[in-house]
């Protein structure tokens, strides 16, 4: 059983020593399950972060995602969102904002996880939802972006859908804690979404994801049980079976007679 949550310094000290685990969760229940399972890093959207979230995952390193262009745009908005996350119990924030914003957050003591490779919010610049870094020129751009984040003061970076040899070489040549999303095991942490791990993703499942449970089938089974229970209730009411005598409150015959006399 873990007794203390890791710090930024702890993650940096473990760079190159082991593979950390990182999961993006969609609910407090998932956060608690991830924490109980021993997940090292839990990422969550800023709208879900709260003191309750921190309580259910006391020993995980929590990264709060500040969604670019939605939760924040300007540097001041990022600073406010970053401090709000830390005050709720987060350990760091994820940001795809510009380098100036990341540098400013670092200056104010907000630990930042950046993003390189395929960045969904900026996918039009790299050709859409597809791998990045498959040519030497493209790989060099990923490397430059990583070094720029390092220079700006980020302590870690998600590297998404980049060829494993490229991601591995980048990880070995940067001080950043490199978090692999579909970029192989040569980085410092592996990152997946809970929806893919748990099998609740009903849309496109990316090639790099791996399913470990089928909660969507279980959800469908439970939903059918709900329908059946509600239908049985409807039938019971309409047939006169509910409520039966055992579920009623009684009244003394004389008291009932007195009541009826009073209202008639």
Question: What is each model feature region?
Answer:
Residues 1-264:
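Alpha/beta enzyme core
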């Amino acid at each position: 059983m873990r007794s203390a949550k890791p710090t930024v310094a702890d993650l940096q000290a473990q760079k190159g020593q082991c593979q950390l685990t990182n999961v993006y969760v969609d609910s407090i229940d998932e956060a608690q399950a991830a924490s109980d399972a021993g997940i090292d890093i839990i990422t969550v959207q800023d709208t879900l972060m709260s003191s309750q979230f921190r309580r259910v995952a006391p020993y995980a390193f929590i990264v709060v995602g500040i969604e670019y262009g939605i939760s924040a745009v300007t540097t001041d908005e990022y600073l406010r969102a970053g401090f709000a996350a830390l005050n709720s119990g987060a350990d760091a924030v994820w940001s795809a904002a510009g380098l100036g914003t990341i540098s400013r957050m670092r200056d104010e003591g907000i630990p930042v996880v950046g993003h390189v490779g395929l960045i969904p919010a900026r996918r039009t610049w790299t050709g859409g939802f597809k791998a990045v870094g498959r040519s030497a020129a493209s790989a060099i751009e990923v490397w430059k972006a990583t070094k720029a984040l390092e220079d700006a003061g980020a302590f870690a970076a998600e590297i998404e859908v980049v060829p494993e040899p490229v991601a591995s070489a980048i990880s070995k040549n940067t001080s950043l804690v490199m978090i692999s999303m579909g970029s192989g095991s040569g980085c410092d942490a592996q990152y997946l979404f809970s929806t893919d791990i748990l099998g609740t993703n009903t849309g496109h499942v990316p090639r790099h994801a791996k399913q470990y449970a089928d909660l969507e089938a279980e959800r469908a089974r439970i939903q059918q049980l709900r329908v059946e229970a509600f239908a049985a209730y409807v039938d019971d009411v309409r047939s006169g079976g509910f409520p039966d005598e055992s579920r009623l409150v009684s009244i003394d015959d004389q008291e009932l007679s007195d009541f009826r006399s009073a209202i008639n």
